[in-house]
């Protein structure tokens, strides 16, 4: 009888062992043991795996293995350490684990209008930069092109081969050689048929909308479009040269903090000690007034991964240059082939902020 009992126990052990090694539905390649106790063998994520992050938003443990247990998502977790889909004020102001999901007014993560529209708590603007078949056939704002990968932008990657929508509209050519087309966003059309805002576009030979980027006392007191600042020299933009000393109108643009009604910055940018919006150490470091951790990541920040697919540097800052993405990079270390939503926002802002050298001096 004892011999039979031992045989039964042995068979149960074998069956249980096989079951525990079977893949878990929805997490192919990960068995029950792996997900709960951790996988043995070579690291599959984190520092020792070139900053790779786990699939399906699994946590990356201190030892570089993917799973959902406390051992993975607790102390030492390297990335994606929050695995549930709740967010917002009732959940420690947590943002959503997927980089492009909005947090709804009820604290759920998603990418529908119910999540990203009225009452949205965080990451509400990011979804605006996704488009196409995987995003409800949404078109891009401001007539931007929708790339084959579903990103909004103006480069050849967006408007060229594979472009899904508005592929012709955001053309940077204009004037008599292009059907007398005018430029988008009230940009000037240069003598040679290109759109821009500097004196080379808006000055001698300009074909259309030649004064739209000018403002102030020398231009009939005109204010800038999109609430941009009007510089001392009568140019529209958002830099300190526009909004600082000598600014003529809309001078609070891109300002934030205690001296500006405790205003927070758009797109989750940090508010510096001096009240300027930005994302570098000068804005998010010492003296930062609000949204100071949005661009922090890695082991010292609960294994947070960077928004918009940016790299997490060895020091826990988000960025997209070699300094962030190479030696010591903690997560998302391979740069995307397409610009991130933020880079698109900043590119457009940079375009609007361009000032002719002679005007600045």
From Swiss-Prot:
GO biological process entries: positive regulation of cell division; positive regulation of mitotic nuclear division
Residues that carry a glycan: 137, 180
Pfam families: Chitin_bind_1
Propeptide: 27-41, 337-361
Protease keyword on record: no
Keywords of this entry: Chitin-binding, Disulfide bond, Glycoprotein, Lectin, Mitogen, Repeat, Signal
SUPFAM superfamilies: Plant lectins/antimicrobial peptides
Signal peptide interval: 1-26
Signal as UniProt keyword: yes
Disulfide bonds: 45-60, 54-66, 59-73, 77-81, 87-103, 96-109, 102-116, 120-124, 131-146, 140-152, 145-159, 163-167, 174-189, 183-195, 188-202, 206-210, 215-230, 224-236, 229-243, 247-251, 256-271, 265-277, 270-284, 288-292, 297-312, 306-318, 311-325, 329-333
GO molecular function, one term: chitin binding
All copies of domain Chitin-binding type-1, residue ranges: 42-83, 84-127, 128-170, 171-211, 212-252, 253-293, 294-335
Record's function text: N-acetyl-D-glucosamine binding lectin. Has high hemagglutinating activity towards human erythrocytes. Shows potent mitogenic activity towards human peripheral blood lymphocytes.
Official protein name in the record: Lectin-B
């Amino acid at each position: 009888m004892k011999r039979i009992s031992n045989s039964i126990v042995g068979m149960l052990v074998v069956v249980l062992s096989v079951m525990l090694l079977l893949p878990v539905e929805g997490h192919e390649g990960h068995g029950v043991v792996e997900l709960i106790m951790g996988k043995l063998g070579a690291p599959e994520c984190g520092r020792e795996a070139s900053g790779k992050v786990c699939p399906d938003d699994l946590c990356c443990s201190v030892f570089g293995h993917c799973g959902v247990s406390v051992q993975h998502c607790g102390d030492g977790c390297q990335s994606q350490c929050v695995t549930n889909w709740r967010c917002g004020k009732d959940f420690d102001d947590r943002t959503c684990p997927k980089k492009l999901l909005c947090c709804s007014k009820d604290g759920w993560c998603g990418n529908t209008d119910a999540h990203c529209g009225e009452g949205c708590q965080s990451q509400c603007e990011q979804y605006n930069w996704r488009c196409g078949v995987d995003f409800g056939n949404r078109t891009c704002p401001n007539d931007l092109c929708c790339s084959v990968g579903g990103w909004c932008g103006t480069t050849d990657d967006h408007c060229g081969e594979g472009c899904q929508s508005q592929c012709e509209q955001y053309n940077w050519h204009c004037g008599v050689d292009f059907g007398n087309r005018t430029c988008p966003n009230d940009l000037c059309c240069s003598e040679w048929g290109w759109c821009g805002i500097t004196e080379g576009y808006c000055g001698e030979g300009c074909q259309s909308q030649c004064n739209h980027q000018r403002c102030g006392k020398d231009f009939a007191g005109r204010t800038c479009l999109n609430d941009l600042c009007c510089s001392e020299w009568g140019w529209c933009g958002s830099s300190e040269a526009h909004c600082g000393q000598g600014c003529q109108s809309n001078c609070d643009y891109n300002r934030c903090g205690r001296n500006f009604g405790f205003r927070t910055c758009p797109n989750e940018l940090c508010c510096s000690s001096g009240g300027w919006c930005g994302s570098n150490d000068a804005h998010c470091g010492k003296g930062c007034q609000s949204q100071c951790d949005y661009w922090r990541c890695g082991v010292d920040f609960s294994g947070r991964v960077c928004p918009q697919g940016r790299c997490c540097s060895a020091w826990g800052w988000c960025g997209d240059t070699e300094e962030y993405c190479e030696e010591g990079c903690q997560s998302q270390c391979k740069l995307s082939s397409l610009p991130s939503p933020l880079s698109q926002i900043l590119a457009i802002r940079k375009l609007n902020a361009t000032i002719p050298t002679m005007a600045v001096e």
